[in-house]
Design a protein with these regions (language model features):
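Hydrophobic, well-structured mid-protein blocks that either form specific transmembrane helices
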Residues: 83-130
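Active-site-proximal beta-strand elements of phosphoester/diester hydrolases
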Residues: 8-17, 100-109, 136-141, 199-205
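Active-site environment of divalent metal-dependent phosphoester hydrolases
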Residues: 17-23, 40-46, 69-77, 97, ...
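Core catalytic region of metal-dependent phosphoesterases/phosphodiesterases
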Residues: 13, 18-98
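Active-site-proximal loop/helix segments of hydrolase catalytic cores
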Residues: 17, 23-26, 116-135, 139-150
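Divalent metal-coordination and catalytic microenvironments
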Residues: 15, 37-38, 63, 68, ...
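Active-site-proximal segments of metal-dependent phosphoesterases and phosphodiesterases across multiple
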Residues: 45, 53, 112, 133-179
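Binuclear metal-dependent phosphoesterase catalytic core
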Residues: 4, 95-99, 167-175, 179-180, ...
């Protein structure tokens, strides 16, 4: 039975790049800890074992992890990586229900150089079509187009380039319409934005200079008569 005004607190981080120990003691309390990818610095299973130990020390009752483009082990040695990650639920184009919330996680981002979990041109729709319609919290490593995806243009000074995925944006706005989309990947665009019924959160822990200085994003999921609503928590 749905409980009106039920509140579930999500603590969201991303892009720690192997520097997770440097944010120890800085994570607020919450019901679910979400890591939106790029856990690792060099992408090895050995690093993942260390991250797993760190996750086990965090007090949150539930933990969800997706991979990012730096997390090579999840693509090159997926069985070893999944075996090493025992302290969190790993989502890769898959979902889970926790505390009445439906989550879906996906590591893919548009092709950029020779990283991991890269979508080749033309593959985007097939990837995002997998997301079910009833997802409350969508966790993607990268942002949708023009939402917290701004980077400096490498060829023209003072110009901003939007590098998010337009097909992901279309899937979110036309089909899924989640209460919350958590992502990272674009360190420069850390922050949050509300657009229609969806709260978008870029939870990149590392700055553009790869310093783990950005605070965790804390979101309260509140159950209403019309379903779940996401709002930034007041700490």
């Amino acid at each position: 039975m749905a409980i009106k005004n039920q509140r579930v607190r999500l603590v969201c981080i991303s892009d720690t790049h192997g520097m997770h120990e440097r944010i120890s003691g800085k994570l607020p309390e919450g019901d679910i800890l979400i890591h939106a990818g790029d856990l690792l610095g060099h992408g090895t299973v050995e690093e993942l074992v260390d991250v797993n130990d760190w996750l086990a020390q965090q007090p949150h009752p539930h933990k969800i992890v997706i991979a990012g483009n730096h997390d090579a082990a999840f693509q090159t040695t997926p069985e070893d990586a999944r075996t090493a990650l025992t302290s969190a639920t790993y989502l890769e184009d898959s979902g889970i229900d926790i505390l009445g919330l439906t989550f879906w996680g996906s590591p893919w981002t548009p092709r950029f150089m020779n990283w991991y979990f890269m979508l080749q041109p033309g593959e985007e729709a097939q990837c995002w079509d997998k997301i079910p319609d009833d997802v409350d919290v969508l966790i993607t490593h990268g942002p949708p187009k023009r939402i917290l995806d701004e980077v400096p243009d490498p060829f023209e000074r003072y110009r901003i380039t939007h590098v998010g995925c337009p097909v992901l944006l279309d899937a979110i706005t036309r089909k899924v319409q989640p209460a919350l989309n958590v992502f990272g990947h674009i360190h420069e665009a850390y922050g949050h934005r509300q657009r229609t019924q969806t709260l978008y959160v870029n939870a990149s822990t590392c700055t553009a200079r790869y310093r783990p200085d950005n605070p965790p994003m804390v979101v309260d999921m509140i159950r209403t008569d019309k379903g779940w609503r996401a709002e930034l928590a007041e700490l």
